[in-house]
Amino acid sequence: MKVFNKNGNEINLIQGTKDIVITPNPGYELLYNYSYATDELAFIIAGIKKNNGVFTMDDDDVARMDVTCKLGTSYCGLGNGTDWTVNSIGYAFISSNTIIIGDRNSLGTQDRAYINLVCRLSWYKH
C-alpha cells in the first residue's frame, strides 16, 4: 500500500528496513520470503518446503539468512503439498543465521513449513 504526505509525496511507513535474503540448503525449497529487518529486529515471514520426505523432530539447518540473530523460537504451521492448509504445529528456531524446522508431533506427513517469527539481531545493544 502506498502512503502519501499532505504534499502528495510518497512516504515509507517503516524507515530503514532491509530485506532479509534466505537461502535454502540442499533438499529444501524456499516457497516465499517476505522477511525484513529493522535496526534491532528481524521479522522472518517465509515458507520452506522439504523436497524429499517430510519434516521430523530430527530436521535442522534447513536454510541460511544474510543476517545474524540472537536465538529466536516460535511455533510454525506445517502442511503438505495438496494445498496451503496448516495441518499440524511444528517449531522454528533461529540460531545465528540458521533456520531450524521440526515437526513437534512427529506426524510424518508434513513437507511445508510456514514461519512467522520475530527475533533480535545479534548486533543490537540496549
Each language-model region and where it sits:
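Extracellular jelly-roll beta-sandwich "head" domains, especially the C-terminal globular C1q domain
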Residues: 29-31, 48-64, 72-126
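Short, hydrophobic/aromatic-rich segments at coil-to-beta transitions
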Residues: 13-19, 70-78
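Extracellular receptor-binding modules and their adjoining Ser/Thr/Gly/Asp/Asn-rich linkers
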Residues: 1-61
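A short, structured loop/turn motif at beta-sheet edges
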Residues: 36-39, 68-72
